[in-house]
Design a protein with these regions (language model features):
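Bacterial Sec-dependent N-terminal signal peptides
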Residues: 1-29
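Long, intrinsically disordered, low-complexity segments
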Residues: 113-116, 191, 274-337, 422, ...
Length: 575
């Protein structure tokens, strides 16, 4: 995909994309392209590139839809930054108080995702006009259906009740009559599935350009959508899970079948998924990733700006780092393992994890930077309980996320300063570990507990061997790493809880946790317990409360509601 981003300026005149407007302003128009001149494979390809480019087209945190700023609502992460007023809209989200329909961040994500859909639909419309002699037509249409499904999926996870724009020939007048309640919850998921099935039936097993989705990517995406759909929310006046659908779970099993992923597998070390160097990009575990580049002739390269607020403020290195999205103490405690090498489940948060005494899952040290250990495994940047590692003087603790950050030694090469800090590290959307965990969850819910536990143990076996960066930690820093596999038999309820915990540990700080809690119907119970336990050590939660049947989803933005001419209905919860 990196190479297809370079031709983006070629389509400015076709779709109104303005990144190259200075170039256009320097020339006198010489005429208008006829319909037949526009309907060429070259122009269709350029429109497809424009749709992909939405993921790298802006120097700000929402540019690639990473979702970390909405995951601060979970028990995995604090907002971070320099106090509660720094990024106050994120603080409102993390305590679930004072969230307004006019918050800029809520509207901004809505607008960006529908802009993505607009570009995709423009590409689909033009592709449909090209002749059958365009050999890539069907494949490009499948790619666009995949991207449209992705945008609708993100919107539905965030706002629940959304207008689906699946008619690429929709007129402006028709668009203004769309309703966000045309489809009920299950029907909305099915709209996304329909696009994905078209993609799945056409996409190839491999792509020359790495950023384009493959058949396996469509399969992984279908599994995820069916898993969300399985947890039915049938009551229009509630966001509660009313039932778990067996048929949808069986679809998850179908689309996570190992035969669909012959080209994929687990990395030997989980950390390989979160390294920017070329030899680690698009590895065996990466099924579909947003591609970023450097040194491509543009000012900064097509960099990942979505993590721009996350790096800490290290003097002489990451100066100006904003220190957002900080791992919570609760998450750190969750990695604590017992004498049997297994998670502590109901008791992990009864005491603060002590690295000098307590056993821990090795993934802790690959997910969370902690005082007493080197930041990003670089001994030149030892972490301490100082302002370097907390702009808020400890209000949000001194932990730092490792999965989004890059070793400061790579500044100027893979880590670059613009308005924020950005890197060329790809953002993996679907990785093979997620596929295994989705399959395990479906098996557990269907009562096939042995198969579920076997899949969890695959993940844990890989975790035990993920020590290439931290092998010296026990002898050098005194940490105690111990993880073991599950043995014996477990009933359905036990297996489900095992899968949920494993998903939290494996996918920690990848912006999935809050959405998982909502999907399971666990959000109110888990988060209100979390708030109550955090108050004594984290004052930001003194007024925090999760209101069931409201806070599971964002409100429909005020500006969108106002412009809908009465066709949109606000989400439940008295916004």
């Amino acid at each position: 995909m990196k190479k297809i981003l370079y031709i983006i300026c070629a389509i400015s005149a076709i779709c109104g994309f303005t990144a190259c407007n200075s170039f256009l302003d320097e020339h006198t128009p010489q005429g208008v392209l006829s319909d037949e001149q526009v309907k060429t494979p070259e122009n269709a390809e350029a429109m497809v590139v424009s749709a992909y480019a939405i993921f790298t087209s802006a120097e700000d945190i929402n540019s690639s839809f990473s979702m970390w700023n909405f995951d601060v609502r979970s028990d995995d992460a604090y907002k971070g930054g320099n106090g509660t007023s720094d990024g106050d809209v994120f603080h409102q989200l993390e305590i679930q108080q004072g969230v307004l329909t006019t918050n800029w961040n809520i509207n901004d994500m809505w607008v960006r995702l529908y802009n993505c859909i607009s570009r995709v639909n423009s590409a689909i419309a033009l592709l449909n006009t090209t002749g059958d002699d365009f050999k890539m037509k069907s494949q490009r249409l499948a790619e666009m259906k995949f991207l449209r499904a992705y945008a609708h999926f993100l919107l539905k996870r965030l706002y629940k009740n959304i207008p689906f724009v699946v008619n690429e020939n929709l007129t402006y007048e028709e668009y203004n009559t769309l309703s966000n309640t045309e489809y009920n919850n299950d029907e909305g998921w099915q709209v996304i599935i329909d696009d994905l099935m078209e993609a799945y039936n056409t996409l190839p097993a491999t792509q020359q350009d790495k950023g384009r989705p493959t058949k396996a990517a469509a399969a992984a995406f279908l599994a995820k959508v069916y898993l969300y759909k399985a947890y039915r929310q049938d009551d229009e006046k509630s966001n509660q899970v009313t039932s778990i659908n067996k048929g949808d779970l069986e679809k998850v099993i179908e689309f996570t079948n190992p035969t669909l992923y012959a080209n994929y597998g687990l990395e030997n070390d989980i950390h390989n998924n979160f390294r920017p160097e070329e030899q680690y990009e698009n590895g065996i575990e990466s099924i579909w990733a947003i591609q970023y580049s450097r040194n491509d002739g543009s000012t900064y390269g097509n960099l990942n700006w979505s993590y721009g607020l996350i790096p800490p403020n290290i003097p002489g290195a990451t100066d100006g780092g904003c220190d957002f999205y900080k791992p919570s103490q609760n998450l750190v405690n969750a990695f604590h393992t017992g004498d049997n090498g297994l998670p502590l489940f109901n008791t992990f948060n009864q005491k603060k994890y002590d690295m000098a005494v307590d056993n821990a899952d090795p993934r802790l040290f690959l997910t969370v930077g902690m005082p007493g250990l080197p930041y990003m495994f670089n001994k030149n940047f030892m972490m301490e309980e100082t302002s370097i590692w907390s702009r808020s003087n400890g209000l949000y603790g001194y932990h730092v996320s490792l999965k989004q950050n890059v070793d400061p030694a790579l500044i100027g090469e893979y880590l670059i300063k613009g308005s924020y800090w950005a890197s060329s590290m790809n953002r993996i959307v679907f990785r093979y570990a997620d596929v295994l965990l989705m399959r395990a969850e479906a098996y557990a819910q269907l009562g096939n507990t042995d198969q579920a536990i076997a899949l969890v143990n695959q993940i844990r076996t890989r975790a035990a061997g993920s020590t290439q960066m931290i092998a010296s930690y026990p002898s050098t820093y005194g940490v105690k790493m111990y993880i073991a596999n599950y043995k014996g038999s477990y009933n359905k309820d036990e297996a489900v809880e095992i899968v949920k915990m494993e998903r939290r540990l494996e996918m920690a700080m990848e912006s999935e946790r809050f959405f998982d809690l909502v999907r399971w119907g666990d959000a109110a119970t888990v988060l209100n317990k979390y708030f109550a336990e955090e108050i004594s050590s984290c004052a930001i939660y003194s007024n925090a409360h999760f209101t069931a049947n409201k806070d599971e989803y964002l409100p429909i933005p005020f500006s969108q509601l106002s412009a809908s001419n009465g066709h949109y209905t606000q989400n439940i919860g008295n916004w």
